[in-house]
């Protein structure tokens, strides 16, 4: 059945989990015209979630589906234009749903931050999804919408100004307040590191800057592109003089998503596009020391985890980390915030900065970004790109999602610096 004639515009799968509940709240508050259903393993838990969502959601149908029973996923996907999924770790639970959406031509969006899940989705399902017309959109939360859309904003502005193509482009996390990590995030990191520590080929792939570009020979040779660089701020932009930056833990994932966006769009950002991510560590007397220390710790933890995580007793890991389904309190979510700034220099020497900021914590923001992605896919279909297959937020939804994000409380914009 054509997606436009299906029973639901959006099915939210995983609605009873921590991120799923937050996403359901955003969808209920959106007051959109979308036909929405909630899905998960337990009808009783789904009813309990729906009861807390307010009057707009009380008529939303409930669907029982389980990743361990692929036929239920395919039946669910066949009823929807769009499936949003918060069920992770995606490395463990995600591929059956990707397969179901690829087979049924259903658009899909997730919150993954797991490189090998992304690579496996591309290798196994990109061609079929492209053939059936499905958009399988990876990383529609804090990983990696801010990274991906900041570069897309810059690309769009540079095209408007006719100032060439993007060259050196650097994201800096300028401010960030996050006081708790969810059990789901820990489980995802653990699963990702378990995969690479058990599989030498997976380890090789995640250390390649172009992990998510399957035609590796088509990528330009731009020399080393370290995942966790440290810089004087002035090396990135004069506006950052006096600041120091260091390794950003999510850079290894986000940078690959951004590079895939460039490749999917026929390298429209530029063939000399070099991209990195760091976090600001301030401009105090201790900032240079903090830059070196943080970068060493982040690079060491990720590198050692990717190689040796399988040697840690799983029971010990589970005992000392947050439980699945847990996350920061409502009060903590409200106190959080973040601001990303992305600086670029073009082939003509013009300089720009893009901003992406949200005045809530990363988890509440993630839910809002996923909900906005779902509404964009369901309601703004005439503004989506023509691309199909396993895609990225910018390549699939760039302009349409940028237009919708301010209504979710996101502050975005570009500034020409010189």
Curated annotation (Swiss-Prot):
InterPro entries: NAD(P)-bd_dom_sf, Saccharopine_DH-like_oxidrdct, Sacchrp_dh_NADP-bd. One of its GO terms (biological process) is glycolipid biosynthetic process. Belongs to the saccharopine dehydrogenase family. Enoyl reductase subfamily. PANTHER family: SACCHAROPINE DEHYDROGENASE-LIKE OXIDOREDUCTASE (PTHR12286:SF5). Keywords: Lipid biosynthesis, Lipid metabolism, Oxidoreductase. GO terms for molecular function: oxidoreductase activity. GO terms for cellular component: plasma membrane. It comes from Mycobacterium leprae (strain TN). Its EC number is 1.3.1.-. Pfam families: Sacchrp_dh_NADP (PF03435). This is Trans-acting enoyl reductase.
């Amino acid at each position: 059945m054509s997606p436009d004639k299906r029973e639901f515009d959006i099915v939210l799968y995983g609605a009873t989990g921590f991120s799923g509940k937050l996403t359901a709240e955003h969808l209920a508050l959106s007051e959109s015209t979308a036909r929405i259903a909630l899905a998960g393993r337990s009808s009783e838990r789904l009813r309990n979630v729906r009861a807390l969502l307010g009057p707009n959601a009380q008529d939303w149908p409930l669907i029982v589906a389980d990743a361990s029973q692929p036929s239920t996923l395919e039946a669910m996907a066949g009823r929807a234009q769009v499936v949003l999924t918060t069920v992770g770790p995606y490395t463990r639970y995600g591929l059956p749903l990707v397969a179901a959406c690829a087979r049924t031509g259903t658009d899909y969006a997730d919150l993954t931050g797991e490189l090998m899940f992304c690579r496996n989705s591309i290798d196994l399902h990109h061609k079929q999804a492209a053939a059936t017309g499905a958009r399988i959109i990876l990383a529609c939360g804090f990983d990696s919408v801010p990274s991906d859309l900041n570069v897309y904003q810059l690309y769009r502005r540079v095209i408007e100004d006719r100032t060439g193509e993007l060259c050196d482009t650097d994201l800096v996390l300028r401010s960030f307040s996050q006081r708790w990590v969810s059990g789901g995030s820990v489980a995802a990191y653990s699963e990702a590191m378990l995969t690479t520590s058990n599989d030498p080929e997976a380890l090789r792939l995640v250390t390649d800057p172009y992990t998510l570009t399957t035609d590796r020979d088509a990528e330009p040779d731009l020399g080393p592109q370290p995942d966790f660089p440290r810089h004087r701020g002035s090396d990135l932009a004069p506006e950052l003089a006096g600041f120091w930056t260091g390794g950003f833990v999510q850079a290894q994932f986000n940078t690959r998503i951004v590079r895939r966006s460039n490749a999917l769009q026929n390298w429209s950002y530029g063939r000399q596009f070099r991209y990195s991510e760091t976090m600001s560590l301030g401009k105090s007397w201790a900032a240079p020391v903090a830059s070196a220390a943080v970068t060493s710790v982040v690079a060491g933890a990720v590198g050692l985890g990717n190689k040796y995580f399988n040697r840690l007793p799983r029971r010990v890991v589970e005992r000392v980390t947050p439980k699945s389904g847990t996350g920061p309190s409502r009060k903590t979510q409200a106190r959080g915030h973040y601001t990303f700034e992305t600086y670029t220099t073009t082939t003509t020497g013009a300089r720009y900065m893009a901003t992406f900021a949200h005045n809530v914590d990363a988890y509440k923001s993630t839910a809002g970004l996923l909900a906005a992605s779902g509404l964009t896919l369901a309601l703004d279909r005439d503004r989506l790109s023509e691309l199909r297959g396993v895609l990225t937020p910018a390549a699939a939804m760039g302009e349409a999602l940028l237009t919708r994000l301010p209504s979710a409380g996101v502050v975005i914009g570009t500034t020409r610096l010189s």
